[in-house]
Amino acid sequence: MKFVDEALIKVEAGKGGNGCLSFRREKFIPRGGPDGGDGGDGGSIYFEASSDLNTLIDFRYTRQYKAENGQSGMGGNCTGKKGEDLTIKVPVGTMVYDADTGELLADISQPGVPMLIAQGGFHGLGNTRYKSSVNRSPRQTTPGSPGESRNLRLELRVLADVGLLGLPNAGKSTLIRAVSSSKAKVADYPFTTLHPGLGVVRVSPYKSFVMADIPGLIEGAAQGAGLGHRFLKHLSRTCVLLHVIDIAPLDGSDPVADAKAILNELTQYNPDLLNKPRWLVLNKIDMLPDAKEREEKIQSIIKGLEWKDKVFSISAIESKGTQELCYALMQLIDEMKKSEA
């Protein structure tokens, strides 16, 4: 299925039903009093997260959503039927913005919890409501009020504990395939990953975390170059970021310069991302079979980046060092979630 993480739609809640103008008409009662009933409230529009969805593609084809209008009141003091509410299902992690004002209306991160987005119109009042000691035959009614109408911008941000960062072909997709059940596409050319992929990493029968494979960044991604600009936003919900670096790139590029390019893009896009825990993952150590040469390369990268946080040397394709990485990630995620509780 095609991955779509942005959509523009219009929602319109139902109009309230009008109040009824009616008088009691029965045999032998020529001047019956008012008996016009109230209208029904208009239906409201709710958004609710569903774990079964992972893309906003449905909103590319259906862009207008309207709840049911309330029924008008009737004689005999009968109240009109309330308009049926409309519940729109979206993927977990969807953010709902007012497209006209930019206001964040809802951050839908919990499945099964409906969130009100557009309030239905209030019902109109029938003429029975206006009967008084000085006005026994009121002809006054009120119409139902219109429901809220909004232009919405939907933005999906994947919910993951760990985000993988790196230039194209750094080996992110290979890593996520090695440690999870994800079937991310892997090939020897840039931009194999065209949308964020999620993999569940299970370190024990009762412990697991979610890893997100973010499409490869290139220099200028924060300004929209390559694929990174659209997907940097998905990093905002992660607990920890992994900088995945190809320790021995075939094109002869400098791994230190590659890592600095990624850091620069993060800084330009959102400096707050740099406050997250960030670990360095040096991938493809299998390309340097000589232990001394490999260790010298690792130390030169750490020194060149002035890296102070954790460093892991792995071979994703051979699953070397990946288990230690996953256990360390699980421990960090558990500690962070306990501190937030």
From Swiss-Prot:
Primary localization class, coarse: cytoplasm
Record's subcellular location: Cytoplasm
Cofactor needs: Mg(2+)
Segments forming domain OBG-type G: 160-334
GO molecular function: GTP binding; GTPase activity; magnesium ion binding
Region feature (Disordered): 128-150
Main EC class the enzyme belongs to: hydrolase
Compositional bias annotation for Polar residues: 129-144
GO biological process: ribosome biogenesis
Binding site for Mg(2+): S173, T193
UniProt key word Metal-binding: yes
Keywords tagged on the record: Cytoplasm, GTP-binding, Hydrolase, Magnesium, Metal-binding, Nucleotide-binding
EC number: 3.6.5.-
Assembly description: Monomer.
PANTHER family from the UniProt entry: DEVELOPMENTALLY REGULATED GTP-BINDING PROTEIN-RELATED, MITOCHONDRIAL RIBOSOME-ASSOCIATED GTPASE 2
NCBIfam families xrefs: Obg_CgtA, PRK12296.1, PRK12297.1, PRK12299.1, small_GTP
Function statement: An essential GTPase which binds GTP, GDP and possibly (p)ppGpp with moderate affinity, with high nucleotide exchange rates and a fairly low GTP hydrolysis rate. Plays a role in control of the cell cycle, stress response, ribosome biogenesis and in those bacteria that undergo differentiation, in morphogenesis control.
Family, as annotated: Belongs to the TRAFAC class OBG-HflX-like GTPase superfamily. OBG GTPase family.
Full protein name: GTPase Obg
Source species of the chain: Legionella pneumophila (strain Lens)
